[in-house]
Regions:
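N-terminal export/targeting and maturation segments
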Residues: 23-71
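Generic domain-boundary/flexible-linker signal
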Residues: 53, 73, 112-114
Length: 133
C-alpha cells in the first residue's frame, strides 16, 4: 500500500469520525392538549436526529403530566414512528372527558400505546388509539 492509499484511508476515517461526532438526538416539546378540567396536559414530544445541522424527525411521544408541569417527569403513554420525509403526518390528542384521551394519527408507520390506562396523581386516564386516513 502506497502513501496515497494511506492518506485516503486517513481522510475517510476523519470524515467518518466527524459525522459520528456531529450526530445527536434532541427532544423538544411540540404542543400540549389540556384536559377539559385543566388538571392534566397531554404533551407531544418530538425526537430528532441531527447530523451536521440537518435534522430529520424520527418519532413522536405522548406524555401525560399535571397541568403546566414539564414533560420530562411525566408518564410516557404512546410512541409514533413516522416515515422519513413524510409530508402529511398528523397527530392529535382529543380529551372526551377529564379521564378519557384519544390519540389520533395519520401517516404513522408504527404506533403503540404503553397501556390502556395510566395513573397520574390520583386520577386514572383511559387511553385509546385511532388511525385517521
Amino acid at each position: 500500500m502506497g502513501p496515497l492509499a494511506s492518506w485516503a484511508r486517513l481522510i475517510v476515517s476523519i470524515s467518518c469520525l466527524t459525522i459520528l461526532v456531529g450526530c445527536r438526538f434532541s427532544y423538544s416539546e411540540t404542543r400540549r392538549w389540556p384536559s377539559p378540567d385543566n388538571q392534566l396536559d397531554a404533551v407531544e414530544v418530538s425526537a430528532a436526529l441531527g447530523v451536521l445541522s440537518v435534522s430529520s424527525s424520527l418519532h413522536r411521544n405522548i406524555y401525560i403530566v399535571k397541568s403546566g408541569e414539564p414533560w420530562l417527569g411525566g408518564s410516557h403513554v404512546a410512541s409514533f414512528q413516522f416515515p422519513k420525509g413524510a409530508q402529511q403526518v398528523q397527530l392529535s390528542a382529543v380529551w372526551s372527558s377529564p379521564s378519557e384521551l384519544t390519540l389520533r394519527s395519520s401517516g404513522a408507520r408504527e404506533a403503540g400505546l404503553n397501556s390502556r390506562e395510566i395513573s397520574v396523581g390520583t386520577r386514572v386516564v383511559r387511553l385509546a388509539l385511532e388511525a385517521v386516513p
